[in-house]
Amino acid sequence: MAERGSDIRPGHILEHNNALYLVVKVMHTQPGKGGAYIQAEMKNLKTGAKQYERFRTDGDIKRAIVDESDYQYIYGDGSMITVMHLKTYEQITISKDILGDKSIYLQDNIVITLVFYNGEIISAKVPDYVTLRVIETEAVIKGQTVSSSSYKVAMLENNQRISVPTFIKPGDKIVVYTPDDSYYERAKG
C-alpha cells in the first residue's frame, strides 16, 4: 500500500529495493536547506542486515501488506519450535531463528505473533512484557540504598543477565521489557 514518507513508523514493514524491511527506528530531519526527510533504520527480513535509508517526507513509500496471527508456544526441539494457532488449533513447526535473539523468552504457553507475507512466515515477535523468576543476584555493595538509583546484575530463569534495582532478590518474579531486554517492574502477585 502506497503511503507518504512522513507516515513511516517503527514496526512497519516496507517493500524497498525488491526486499522486505522492518523499520526499527525513525528520525525526522529538517535541514537548513532543502526539503525535510525521514532517516530510517531498517532491518532486511531475509538477510537480517541493518540499513539506513532516507525518505522524502512527501515521497511515496510502499508498505507491505502482511497478516499477523497469534500462536502459542508448545515445545522446542533443538533449532525448531512447535507452535499452535490460537483459533484453529493448527500446529506448525518453525525455525527458532525466526525469533532471532528474542528466542530466549520462549517459555511454556507464551503467545508469539507470526507475521505472514504472501503466505510465508517472514518474522515473529514475542510479547513486549514477559514475567521471569530471578535465580541469583550480585551482592549489594555497602552504602547502596533502596532509594538510590543503583542497580545490580541478576541471573534470570532463562539464563539471561540483566540489571535490576538493589531491592530485587533471588526468587522474586520480575517483568522484563523485551524490545530492549531491560527490567520493567517487580511482578505483581
Curated annotation (Swiss-Prot):
SMART domains: EFP, Elong-fact-P_C. Pathway: Protein biosynthesis; polypeptide chain elongation. One of its GO terms (molecular function) is translation elongation factor activity. GO terms for cellular component: cytoplasm. GO terms for biological process: peptide biosynthetic process. It comes from the Bacteria. Disulfide bonds: none annotated. The keyword Protein biosynthesis applies. Its main location: cytoplasm. It is found in: Cytoplasm. Involved in peptide bond synthesis. Stimulates efficient translation and peptide-bond synthesis on native or reconstituted 70S ribosomes in vitro. Probably functions indirectly by altering the affinity of the ribosome for aminoacyl-tRNA, thus increasing their reactivity as acceptors for peptidyl transferase. This is Elongation factor P. It comes from Ehrlichia canis (strain Jake). The lineage of its organism: Bacteria, Pseudomonadati, Pseudomonadota, Alphaproteobacteria, Rickettsiales.
